[in-house]
Amino acid sequence: MTEPATPPAPVSAVRIDGPWTHRDVAANGARFHVAEAGDGPLVLLLHGFPQFWWSWRHQLTALADAGFRAVAMDLRGVGGSDRTPRGYDPANLALDITGVVRSLGEPDAAIVGHDLGGYLAWTAAVMRPKLVRRLAVASMPHPRRWRSAMLSDVKQTAAGSYIWGFQRPWIPERRLVADDAALTGRLIREWSGPRLPDDEAVEVYRRAMCVPSTAHCSIEPYRWMVRSLARPDGIQFNRRMKMPVRVPTLHLHGSLDPVMRTRSAAGSGEYVEAPYRWRLFDGLGHFPHEEDPVAFSTELINWLKDPEPDR
């Protein structure tokens, strides 16, 4: 006898109350949920896997208090955003992001991305440079660096083994939501350093993963990233990413990140023809913005306010 399926969570589960406002914006043929706080220059925050906009809750308030308009968006297919049947390649997801910038009525934004959100932030800075004022990336190397590390570094290939597991049809989705998304919680705990997110936060992420179609849409970008390696569209994307990033860039990484090795992330500055700042957080894992939100927010805000960020 099979075990009963995990009951789906309502979309309202991701519209969590706090010192921010929720709204929906249209961009690139879809509807995107955002949480917004503060007034000032726009800072757009992009979450990673297996999370949603709420991972930036600490930075939303810190940035608002520092005089910025902080907006955390749910990526396509996640949280409160539309779950479309296609459109999960990084080039299109980057157009989602820059489209949201325009829909928010701003000429440009400082884009801050973590994990998959970081991959897309790098991409947006190359594809739509006029809409990206500054770039900050956490826990993710430049896409070309990611590609070379995954293909040539045995230790990085092993560290990112979950991505290879995502290539099977349907099984990964079922595993992510089984037993009230227990695997989602386990991944967050295993990928964190000693200051892992508390049990309450992990429960929020587990519940969000149980919103219908979230698991499938969350892993579709990773399927593209692997399956396109030898396809014309993937080769074309990799060539396009040779174009240098020409905006000031802050690269943040946890020294204990078990998913993206420090060696893999470091060196991404070779793709930046602008001031590039690398900061390694000692003792933090894959989620530095949640593991030590004060240190992360301080580093980010100081850099955003620096009129001439150093290399």
Segment roles from a protein language model:
Residues 27-36:
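A short loop-to-beta-strand scaffold at the N-terminal edge of the catalytic core in hydrolase folds
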Residues 2-23, 32, 71, 78-112, ...:
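Flexible "cap/lid" subdomain of the alpha/beta-hydrolase fold that forms the substrate-access gate
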Residues 52-53, 119, 284:
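A short, glycine- and basic residue-enriched loop/turn
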Residues 55, 96, 217, 295, ...:
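Charged catalytic carboxylate motif
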Residues 284-293, 297:
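Catalytic histidine-centered segment of alpha/beta-hydrolase-like enzymes
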Residues 49, 141, 287:
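Active-site pre-Tyr helix/loop in NAD(P)-dependent dehydrogenases
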